[in-house]
């Protein structure tokens, strides 16, 4: 799920935009102070600072954490960053909450170059007009000792320790003998910072902001922020672009502006009337929130409301109350907002002309929290975001994420025990955890939330957007496009898939990488200008006659590293090929003459890790593994490796991939993880942007992967155990690809039975509900994969 800047700002103490949270462009330091003696009083942080150039950015930060683990006062100077090359004092003032526990003070540096800080001072207003200083450690950096890379008394909060260093300077002092000097070097992907800085000024200069409580048909009011171009008039009208989100549309207040008010810099500069709404039950909106609100097909009264009706009512209000619009509305959103975009397009308001569900959630049994019904344990940490009830409308986060006891997610989850034990310890009152654990199968609870089944007789034009390396909602993008195609002949429906992780097309990073692999320059900008911008411009500002000049499918080939155009997706100029998991762990294009098998022992106490990235295994959601080098897994005895010889010609796979396994187990349940891998030649050179310590020679690039639980082999609604030692057929989708395996490369398939902690462990002893499994239910089992197992894919002619 795509959580924008507001969550990242809280989690990382400092960040002004999602771009910085996702890239190695920033560093921060902090001190913690006991706030309890100062509860209810005013405070003021002052410090001197300067930057080497106006192309970099620094900020002071104050955050107050309350005793209830929720955040109180917070200011990171997002709206007034430090970009001065001369010394100047800056300050943050605010009130300490009555139930305050801890005050965090510090500074942030973003970008390359030198940053300077001195003379930190935290003061408390003891009586009206009288301020007293709170003791800080090394506030003026006169103790010129660097310990563990930091000045004495200060703690790290940083994105990349290799790209920032700290030292003391006597030549650039503000006060006393020394000042702190921070240096950013070789920081890549500065496009996001530069874009952020330029858009911040552009939005304030070119848009007016207004806020409203918009009534729905049942009386509930939805909080709405409107950004209108200043040059809008009766002679210069603009279309409306709507975004509905559960993640907060802040900053709230007519004088506080968001920097990225639209889908892209391109569209912001072209100008639209941008409308943002907190969805029902979230943040400043009234009502009660429901995850993946079930769609009501036949509404019988005003009390029958869903996301479709809320979108309809919102658009109706906009047309009547927002001046200078041209009568056309568009809607877009990434991840959860993508779900709301899909929902808004069903039984849509006639003015809704164009929509773009981007990495949309389609069905929680295949997106985000599950893959083929297997629980995505890597999501465990973010359950409070979606499962803690809100007491009343608020402009603050009301939930609290539990503190990570270690950055090593693999070790934490392995030692934490069963899902039952984890839930009892952390989420006893979390309603989403209760829903997930009480509905282990694809019952009516999940089926009612499958929004794509309602995509029939749709009217708006669609641009469906996804990323080939989207760990969260790859399924959602592909199935949304396919359901529209299948059930709506004649609808304008196009799709684009790029070399992106979840939502990464929304922010330009310059030299685009996913994890360790470089894919090209300015790819997000290309998408924003040539695909997304062109789509909305045509349907909202131009003729809307469907002659957009865009292909039905604009797909990035992850082997050739270039976009390709298709008249339809999946493509039809293909030959269906089978790749058999042959004897001696060979991968063959011919069926075996005799049936043999490969076997391995699966031990739930020693599961196969899904990544070698220790800290990445305990993130908000697992992401980088989608293109990760698989050599770490290939060497394990509980991972089977099937491989072709060196290819004598290019082979391009395009479209759906099917897995057909013939297996057995000594247990009564098992998981099956299948990974399709491009093995680079032994002489593959590194790119200019390959990270230090990484070699592409022999790199095992994971192209596509998926997990399947045996109990669901015949039905996701009615699971059943396996019969020990009985050969059993397991079929599932590996999802679509467009990838050229080049001459000299090898094609590899890995098969394993755990993928931890991205996904939960199978006990391998059948139990009706794995969420209720006891520790004694987890057993070792021997799995066999027979040589008549195969992967089926389309080879483009």
Write out the residue ranges for each language-model feature:
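Accessory cap/linker subdomain of secreted extracellular hydrolases
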Residues: 257-260, 269, 291-294, 298-304, ...
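Extracellular and organelle-lumenal recognition/adhesion modules and their flexible linkers in secreted
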Residues: 20-195, 618-623, 627-628
């Amino acid at each position: 799920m795509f959580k924008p800047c507001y969550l990242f700002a809280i989690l990382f103490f400092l960040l002004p935009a999602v771009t910085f949270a996702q890239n190695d462009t920033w560093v921060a330091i902090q001190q913690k102070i006991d706030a309890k003696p100062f509860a209810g009083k005013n405070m003021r942080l002052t410090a001197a600072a300067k930057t080497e150039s106006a192309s970099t950015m620094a900020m002071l930060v104050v955050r107050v954490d309350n005793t209830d683990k929720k955040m109180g006062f917070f200011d990171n100077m997002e709206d007034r960053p430090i970009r001065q090359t001369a010394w100047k004092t800056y300050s943050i003032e605010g009130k300490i909450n009555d139930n305050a526990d801890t005050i965090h003070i510090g500074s942030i540096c973003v970008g390359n170059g030198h940053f300077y800080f001195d003379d930190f001072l935290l003061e408390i207003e003891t009586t009206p007009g009288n301020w007293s200083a709170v003791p800080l450690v090394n506030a003026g950096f006169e103790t010129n000792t660097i310990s563990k890379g930091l000045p004495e008394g200060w703690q790290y909060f940083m994105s990349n320790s290799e790209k920032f260093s700290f030292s003391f300077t006597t030549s650039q002092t503000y006060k006393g003998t020394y000042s702190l000097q921070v240096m950013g070097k070789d920081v890549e992907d500065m496009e996001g910072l530069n874009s952020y800085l330029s858009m911040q000024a552009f939005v304030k200069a070119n848009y007016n902001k207004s806020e409203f409580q918009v009534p729905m048909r049942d009386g509930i009011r939805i909080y709405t922020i409107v950004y209108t171009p200043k040059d809008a008039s009766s002679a210069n009208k603009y279309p409306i672009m709507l975004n509905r989100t559960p993640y907060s549309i802040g900053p709230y207040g007519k004088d506080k502006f968001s920097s990225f008010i639209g889908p892209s810099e391109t569209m912001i500069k072209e100008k639209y009337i941008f409308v943002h709404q907190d969805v029902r039950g979230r943040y400043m909106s009234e009502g009660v929130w429901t995850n993946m609100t079930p769609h009501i097909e036949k509404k019988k009264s005003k009390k029958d409301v869903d996301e479709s009706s809320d979108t309809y009512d919102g658009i109706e209000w906009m047309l009547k109350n927002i001046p200078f619009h041209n009568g056309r509305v568009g809607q877009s959103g990434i991840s959860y907002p993508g779900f709301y975009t899909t929902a808004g397009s069903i039984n849509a308001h006639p003015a809704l002309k164009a929509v773009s569900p981007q990495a949309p959630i389609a069905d929680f049994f295949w997106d985000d929290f599950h893959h083929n019904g297997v629980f995505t344990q890597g999501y465990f940490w973010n359950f409070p975001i979606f499962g803690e009830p809100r007491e009343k409308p608020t402009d603050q986060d009301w939930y609290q994420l539990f503190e990570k006891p270690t950055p090593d997610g693999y070790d934490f989850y392995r030692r934490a025990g069963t899902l039952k034990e984890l839930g009892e310890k952390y989420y006893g009152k979390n309603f989403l955890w209760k829903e997930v654990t009480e509905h282990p199968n694809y019952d009516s609870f999940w089926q009612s939330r499958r929004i794509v089944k309602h995509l029939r007789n749709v009217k708006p034009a669609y641009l469906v957007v996804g990323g080939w390396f989207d760990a969260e909602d790859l399924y959602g993008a592909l199935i949304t496009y396919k359901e529209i195609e299948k059930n709506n002949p004649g609808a304008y429906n196009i799709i684009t898939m790029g070399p992106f992780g979840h939502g990464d097309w929304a922010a330009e990073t310059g030299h685009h990488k996913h994890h360790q692999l470089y894919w090209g320059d300015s790819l997000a900008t290309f998408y924003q200008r040539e695909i997304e911008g062109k789509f909305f411009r045509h349907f909202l500002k131009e003729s809307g006659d469907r002659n957009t000049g865009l292909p039905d499918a604009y797909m990035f080939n992850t082997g050739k590293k270039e976009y390709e155009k298709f008249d339809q997706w999946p493509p039809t100029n293909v030959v269906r090929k089978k790749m058999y998991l042959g004897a001696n762990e060979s991968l063959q294009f011919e069926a075996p003459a005799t049936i043999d098998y490969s076997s391995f022992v699966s031990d739930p106490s020693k599961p196969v890790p899904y990544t070698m990235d220790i800290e990445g295994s305990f993130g908000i959601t697992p992401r980088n593994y989608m293109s990760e080098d698989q050599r770490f897994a290939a060497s394990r005895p509980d991972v089977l490796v099937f491989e072709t010889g060196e290819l004598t010609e290019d082979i391009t796979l395009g479209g759906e991939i099917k897995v057909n396994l013939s297996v057995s187990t000594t247990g009564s349940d098992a998981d099956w993880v299948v990974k399709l891998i491009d093995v680079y030649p032994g002489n593959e050179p590194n790119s200019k942007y390959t990270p230090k310590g990484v070699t592409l020679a022999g790199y095992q690039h994971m192209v596509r992967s998926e997990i399947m639980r045996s109990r669901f082999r015949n039905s996701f609604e009615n699971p059943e155990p396996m019969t020990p030692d009985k050969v059993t057929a397991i079929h599932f989708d590996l999802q679509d690809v467009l990838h050229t395996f080049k001459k000299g490369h090898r094609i590899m398939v890995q098969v394993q039975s755990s993928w931890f902690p991205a996904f939960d462990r199978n006990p391998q002893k059948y139990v009706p509900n794995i969420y209720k499994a006891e520790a004694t239910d987890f057993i070792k089992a021997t799995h066999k994969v027979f040589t008549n197992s195969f992967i089926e894919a389309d080879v483009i002619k």
